Amino acid sequence: MANILKTIIENDKGEIRRLEKMADKVFKYEDQMAALTDDQLKAKTVEFKERYQNGESLDSLLYEAFAVVREGAKRVLGLFPYKVQVMGGIVLHHGDVPEMRTGEGKTLTATMPVYLNALSGKGVHVVTVNEYLSERDATEMGELYSWLGLSVGINLATKSPMEKKEAYECDITYSTNSEIGFDYLRDNMVVRAENMVQRPLNYALVDEVDSILIDEARTPLIVSGANAVETSQLYHMADHYVKSLNKDDYIIDVQSKTIGLSDSGIDRAESYFKLENLYDIENVALTHFIDNALRANYIMLLDIDYVVSEEQEILIVDQFTGRTMEGRRYSDGLHQAIEAKEGVPIQDETKTSASITYQNLFRMYKKLSGMTGTGKTEEEEFREIYNIRVIPIPTNRPVQRIDHSDLLYASIESKFKAVVEDVKARYQKGQPVLVGTVAVETSDYISKKLVAAGVPHEVLNAKNHYREAQIIMNAGQRGAVTIATNMAGRGTDIKLGEGVRELGGLCVIGTERHESRRIDNQLRGRSGRQGDPGESQFYLSLEDDLMKRFGSERLKGIFERLNMSEEAIESRMLTRQVEAAQKRVEGNNYDTRKQVLQYDDVMREQREIIYAQRYDVITADRDLAPEIQSMIKRTIERVVDGHARAKQDEKLEAILNFAKYNLLPEDSITMEDLSGLSDKAIKEELFQRALKVYDSQVSKLRDEEAVKEFQKVLILRVVDNKWTDHIDALDQLRNAVGLRGYAQNNPVVEYQAEGFRMFNDMIGSIEFDVTRLMMKAQIHEQERPQAERHISTTATRNIAAHQASMPEDLDLSQIGRNELCPCGSGKKFKNCHGKRK
């Protein structure tokens, strides 16, 4: 182990020496660039672009380009990048992560690789964790880029598709990670190529890269469509039942945060819902509601996992930042179960139309890099998942912060009492204090204690993060006391006020250890920026989550023997033990993310195939007849082959029924037409007849553009519907194969094999539906459209299934508004023939 660590340290030192030499080459151009006039310096951008177009690589342009940015930054921003910032910029250009401490100027560091890569004209995405940082950085650094002749765009959620497209067309685009993901998904749901907003993903530079690529790696971005099933009553019933349970009726696994019914709980469920057997196959839906109600009531905690807004909505709290995640909902019905628990209106359950995780989104970029102050602890994951190295960059000035050993108390109460006393003492001498908490309720609790102690303070948590930057900027002033959930205000520097250095700088107090060392290091890093003095101190108790999960029983005995209910244990050994526990949790979390990626890679491969074919359809300026006719041919072959082993009479009857109801006019084919033919001859006979029907259908459109539009809309409508259903099916499969793991089967291998089979089935189903709709659609004879704008509407309107006509003798007054329409459209009656005129 010691040898491995030695090798890693030596490698890092060698890398630093190499970067220093490269930075020196940039510095050699300093005088040359300083001698240029403003116009001459700006003209360098055009020169670099031409040299790149003529075959010169970005690597060879690096030294001059970085020197141009340094000089430009000095003239425009009044900032001159240090050597360590140039080194960080080189690492970013190479597609790696420079680990740069808080306050080392990561934003300015990014300007050099962003400028260099923007010269290619293929687009650079600067990715931030929230829109405030996107707008701030785009405004501040955009001044420099614009001065140097590059265009800068900001992609915000509120922008229209046209505005988004303009932002993505710029040389440099600032955006949040979620908006890039949603735009990618939406681009793959449009019907026309001109409605796509993104260009191919080229180079991403991700700010706070660990937060996005590690903490949020498993977060799926989901574009949903409302599900028509009205299930709010079942949510309320399940919630009412679960609230009636005793502690013996359910079993919670604290480590894995899972919950299930005990035997007595099952008995109570069968009695409550009047069932013979809760786990009969017909009760599968009900057990799903009960499982969610259990999780909502006994696992998900108010003010820790979620908050209830003033608008009576459930808002998820990000466990790493403490911010509420606007617009984000728990999937699979859990969010509705929480709504039932809290007695707020239950919103419609949604169906996933498209989804992608950040892991797979960012792996699609040709080059990916990012910045963080705390990436080394996750180096293995960056390397294994993203093929990125983490290179620690030296600080411009030595770190002067004093990190005290952890203080461990027997109870939460005695811990918080000590925290309040410490804060009060520091406040009285004028030293600013930042108190970091892991949950909203902890912030509120400490706030009440400080009010009682007469200590004025600011609270920054998920409930008021819109004031984040303002509060954080003032946190370094004399006498300032700020309480913040761990990651709040990240990206905004805390600058020390007048006279604060002499008082010891900013003191950071952690109220418990996070399960990730990196988050603790980020909290510590708020103090001691740019060589400032500072302190950090963590207060722990045996009742903290991390301590309860890993070995607090032995320490509890020590406290009891020494009768130390109010006193603290302080030792380096304790700090090392806590870090060992954190390493175990980090290892577990990494293994989980790695497994999620194995599952998601199945979806990724399938998504890429579907999206590539979809893109081919929407960008095709050609007649898609060859593609559709191939689908018809394969559909015929599947049907005939599928009945190959049946008795001759049964086989012919099945094939005839298929042909009548899906392929040809009903009265145009009889049993005599097929009898006596081999399977091969039947396939050929049906295909030739189908081609005549196809030609007849297309001839009704009488316009080449209308034909193309009809073909596109037909294929895309079927593909999108089937893909949406397939995503749901894969989600259900994933849950199911998890159970198969108990039968000694590898669930990932099972998922891959079953997922591949399901994908092939979906392709067959797509081709079948395209065939049926193409052959059976009622296409009305129409004149040539007068203007192109009419084409889409008429072509879309003409896709009406042959069966979608209403029986003449039906009494419509007897049909419920939420029942399926009898015309066969698949819509609810109220949305079809029951629409109020």
Curated annotation (Swiss-Prot):
Signal peptide, first to last residue: none
GO biological process, one term: protein import
SMART domains membership: SecA_DEAD, SecA_PP_bind
Annotated binding of Zn(2+), by residue: C821, C823, C832, H833
Gene Ontology MF: a single term: metal ion binding
Alphabetized InterPro entries for the sequence: Helicase_ATP-bd, Helicase_C-like, P-loop_NTPase, SEC_C_motif, SecA, SecA_CS, SecA_DEAD, SecA_motor_DEAD
Residues bound to ATP: Q85, G103, E104, G105, K106, T107, D493
Pfam families in the cross-refs: P-loop_SecA, SEC-C, SecA_DEAD, SecA_PP_bind, SecA_SW
Assembly description: Monomer and homodimer. Part of the essential Sec protein translocation apparatus which comprises SecA, SecYEG and auxiliary proteins SecDF. Other proteins may also be involved.
Role, per record: Part of the Sec protein translocase complex. Interacts with the SecYEG preprotein conducting channel. Has a central role in coupling the hydrolysis of ATP to the transfer of proteins into and across the cell membrane, serving as an ATP-driven molecular motor driving the stepwise translocation of polypeptide chains across the membrane.
Name of the featured protein: Protein translocase subunit SecA
Species: Streptococcus pneumoniae (strain Taiwan19F-14)
